[in-house]
């Protein structure tokens, strides 16, 4: 596989207004109920060129996780330098067969490879936000996306805070609301762009997605952004969420996996996490009823089909739950320290693993109820998503992803937000028929990992969204913000 950064075999593309322009085209779905335009088996994805010990762009190998008793998970890892820092990046797939999981994993690995830093094009605009505005150029304001607290910068003086007069690199994106090119700070879309001097936040792969068509990739990127925003609003805002009865699912695979988790000692619970938009978001929790080590893990899913959203959340918790007790016991001393000092929650994996400690599970009582507390009965899919009393119908799905995407974008922009798309596709992905994008919705809550990095805690939306959605009568006061690390994986 050619290295997209090789000076000999790379084929860089110019970052121009014309290249950033997006025109949504018809994207017929593969089949009814699907949100893909191609079957995953149709991509030419031999593993060896991507994962081999000599020149594997996605690392030396892909490993089958035979310890998993719920899904046939596969895992790969590659390392990449960002300045002097060497970062390990994991990728993988979670499906019913190893063959499918490998293909999903390679696609995810390529998506991560494309999104970590710009490989197909180079940032050609270096300017301050003030200078861009003086020139009349549209640009995403990092202050709207979210910034770290002053306390973070005092503790980490090498990470300089953003100021509107500071020159930084920008890449071109496309505003789906305004129908025009918009400049995006490079570090907000390429989350490991080299050069610490340009970094004022550490972004993640949130909003990055791949698909067999541009419309498919943008749809899934937007769903991810909406999902994480809703999860954080409900967690930090301690929102009471309606519980979904998974046994009312029309999908046999969903009901069977819920039963399988019960056999392994975990109850699978699911919650309707729609806050601001008529787009189904489901939070899943796998809970040990006995409250022991490996107490609980969380997952989430989003999409126009609530059954698919729940299945996405279920896949995450099914994969993690069966190994959680062992992972908790192996690292118990370090994880238990996090329960008493949240500043020790420093990295991505710390957030979900901390909730393997029994006492951390108490922080989820607002959602799950305290042990022994009488539960409200869960509601069926038809009750929650139908048009009957108490139901909140979701946006209708069509047979074309372009129409689904338009409906979702319209719902988000009607609430006052923009939807910005940056095309991250590498030439090597394009040759496979893939498109990779980064979707930003400035103003929605961003997902961060590390307790000191939680931008969501300082953003206006955390205080206003539940009131605007009719979930409470007033803005969320500071005293009611749940100042506890989120458990998102």
In which residue ranges do the predicted regions lie?
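Helix-biased "structured C-terminal domain" signature
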Residues: 2-489
């Amino acid at each position: 596989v050619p290295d997209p950064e090789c000076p000999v075999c790379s084929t860089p593309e110019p970052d121009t207004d014309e290249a950033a322009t997006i025109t949504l085209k018809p994207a017929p779905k593969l089949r009814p109920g699907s949100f893909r335009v191609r079957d995953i088996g149709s991509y030419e994805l031999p593993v060896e060129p991507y994962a081999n010990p000599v020149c594997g762009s996605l690392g030396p190998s892909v490993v089958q996780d035979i310890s998993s008793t719920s899904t046939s998970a596969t895992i790969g890892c590659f390392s990449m330098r960002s300045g002097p820092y060497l970062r390990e990046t994991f990728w993988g797939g979670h499906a019913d067969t190893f063959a499918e999981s490998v293909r999903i994993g390679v696609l995810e690995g390529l998506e991560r490879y494309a999104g970590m830093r710009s490989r197909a094009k180079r940032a050609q605009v270096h300017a301050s936000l003030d200078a861009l505005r003086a020139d009349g150029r549209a640009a995403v304001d990092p202050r709207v996306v979210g910034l770290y607290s002053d306390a973070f910068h005092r503790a980490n003086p090498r990470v300089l805070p953003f100021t509107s007069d500071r020159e930084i690199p920008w890449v071109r994106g496309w505003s789906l609301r305004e129908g025009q090119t918009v400049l995006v700070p490079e570090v907000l879309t390429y989350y490991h762009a080299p050069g610490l001097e340009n970094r004022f936040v550490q972004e993640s792969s949130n909003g990055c997605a791949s698909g067999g068509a541009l419309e498919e990739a943008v749809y899934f990127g937007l769903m991810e952004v909406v999902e994480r925003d809703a999860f954080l609003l409900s967690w930090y805002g301690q929102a009471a969420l309606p519980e979904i009865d998974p046994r009312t699912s029309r999908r046999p695979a969903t009901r069977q996996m819920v039963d399988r988790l019960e056999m392994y000692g975990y109850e699978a619970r699911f919650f309707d996490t729609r806050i601001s938009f008529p787009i189904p978001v489901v939070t899943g929790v796998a809970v040990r009823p006995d409250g022991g080590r490996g107490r609980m893990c969380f997952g989430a899913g989003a999409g126009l089909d609530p059954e698919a959203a729940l299945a996405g959340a279920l896949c995450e918790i099914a994969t993690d739950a069966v190994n959680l007790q062992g992972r908790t016991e192996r690292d118990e001393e370090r994880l238990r320290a996090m329960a008493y000092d949240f500043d020790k929650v420093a990295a991505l994996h710390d957030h979900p693993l901390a909730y393997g400690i029994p006492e951390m599970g108490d922080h989820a009582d607002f959602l799950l109820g305290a042990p022994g507390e009488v539960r409200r009965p869960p509601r069926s899919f038809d009750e929650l998503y139908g048009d009957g009393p108490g139901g909140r119908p979701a946006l209708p799905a069509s047979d074309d992803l372009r129409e689904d995407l338009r409906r979702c974008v319209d719902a988000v922009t009607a609430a006052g937000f923009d939807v910005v798309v940056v095309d991250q596709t590498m030439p090597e992905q394009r040759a496979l028929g893939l498109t990779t994008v980064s979707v930003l919705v400035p103003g929605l809550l961003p997902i961060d990992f590390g307790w000191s990095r939680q931008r969501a805690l300082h953003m206006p939306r955390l205080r206003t969204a539940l009131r605007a959605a009719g979930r409470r009568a007033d803005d969320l006061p500071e005293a009611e913000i749940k100042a506890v690390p989120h458990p998102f994986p």
